[in-house]
From Swiss-Prot:
Keywords: Disulfide bond, G-protein coupled receptor impairing toxin, Secreted, Toxin
Organism: Dendroaspis angusticeps (Eastern green mamba)
Entries under CDD domains matching the protein: Kunitz_dendrotoxin (cd22595)
GO cellular component assignments: extracellular space
Disulfide bonds: C5-C55, C14-C38, C30-C51
Name of the protein: Mambaquaretin-1
Family stated for the protein in its record: Belongs to the venom Kunitz-type family.
Biotechnology: Is a new promising drug for aquaresis-related diseases, including hyponatremia, and a molecular probe to visualize in vitro and in vivo V2R expressed physiologically or under pathological conditions. Is a new promising therapeutic agent against polycystic kidney diseases (PKD). It shows renoprotective effect on the murine model for PKD, since the number of renal cysts and the total area of cysts is significantly reduced after treatment with this protein.
Matches recorded under Pfam families: Kunitz_BPTI
Misc: Negative results: shows a weak inhibition on trypsin (PRSS1) (IC(50)=14.8 uM) and Kv1.1/KCNA1 (IC(50)=8.2 uM). Does not interact with vasopression V1a, V1b and the oxytocin receptors. Does not show activity on potassium (except Kv1.1), sodium, and calcium (Cav1.2) channels. Does not show agonist and antagonist activities on the 156 GPCR tested. Does not activate pathways of the vasopression V2 receptor.
Subcellular location: Secreted
Length: 57
């Protein structure tokens, strides 16, 4: 799995409400979170399928 999968979930400082998904190393699963729309990090996916395909394997 790519190293960015191990980054912590980071909603970012902006106030948008965008549905996104991140990989949790602790649970070895993808979870939903609300992305604010700016900054954040690479551990953010638009669909749970993309998250699973990239980080869970």
């Amino acid at each position: 799995r790519p190293s960015f999968c191990n980054l912590p979930v980071k909603p970012g400082p902006c106030n948008g409400f965008f549905s996104a998904f991140y990989y949790s190393q602790k649970t070895n699963k993808c979870h939903s979170f609300t992305y604010g729309g700016c900054k954040g990090n690479a551990n953010r996916f638009s669909t749970i399928e993309k998250c699973r395909r990239t980080c869970v394997g």
